[in-house]
Each structure stands twice: as C-alpha cells, then as structure tokens.
From Swiss-Prot:
Quaternary organization: Part of the 50S ribosomal subunit. Contacts protein L32.
Protein name in the entry: Large ribosomal subunit protein bL17
Family of the protein in this entry: Belongs to the bacterial ribosomal protein bL17 family.
GO cellular component terms, semicolon-separated: cytosolic large ribosomal subunit
SUPFAM superfamilies: Prokaryotic ribosomal protein L17 (SSF64263)
InterPro entries: Ribosomal_bL17, Ribosomal_bL17_CS, Ribosomal_bL17_sf
Record-linked HAMAP family: Ribosomal_bL17 (MF_01368)
Originating species: Geobacillus stearothermophilus (Bacillus stearothermophilus)
One GO BP: translation
Chain's gene name: rplQ
Gene3D superfamilies in the cross-refs: Ribosomal protein L17
Keywords: Ribonucleoprotein, Ribosomal protein
Amino acid sequence: MSYRKLGRTTSQRKALLRDLATDLIINERIETTEARAKELRAVIEKMITLGKRGDLHARRQAAAFIRKEVANSETGQDALQKLFSDIAPRYQDRQGGYTRIMKLGPRRGDGAPMVIIELV
C-alpha cells in the first residue's frame, strides 16, 4: 500500500490528518513525528493545489476536508479563507513542493523521530 496506517483505524487516521492539515495551514509550521509529516505532506500538497485552482468546486472540496477553525482572531479569518487568499497565491508559479521537512532529534520518552514540517 502507498500510505502509512500510523497505528490507527481509517476514521482515526483521517481525523488526525485533517487536524494536522488545518494546524499547518493556520500556523504554517508544526512539529510532529516523521511518519505523520510524510503522510501530511501528500495531503497538504493537494489542499494547496485546490487553493491555486480557486474555483467554487475546489473551495467546496477543500472545505469538506479542512476543519472550520479561526486562523486569525483579529480579522476573523478561518483556515479555509487563509488557504485560498494567503497561502495559495504565494505558490502560483510553483508546481508542487510546497512543504519542507526538517529533522529534529528523537522524542524524549519513546525515541520517535521528530521533524518540523513547514510551508516553503
């Protein structure tokens, strides 16, 4: 199979990736395990590509996946609006490769390999 199960059932895995994708859109940089980051990379690339398309169908597809969380409390902008108005225009000239994964040390406690995933 071409994906990682991350020790979860299908619904738990989808919920985890939705949460991580929403957090990455809001914060533009998160710290997580290497396996989660590699799975998240594929999801977030698709979301940014939808944002670049920018039509109504792309917006609805992204809205079905991204959680409805406030990205900026001062302006009241939510994660979906941030994706389509702030993040996607940045990558208009770039064909993929919107994220960077930088390795950190192992996590204290269980030794899981930790990384920082961020938008380029």
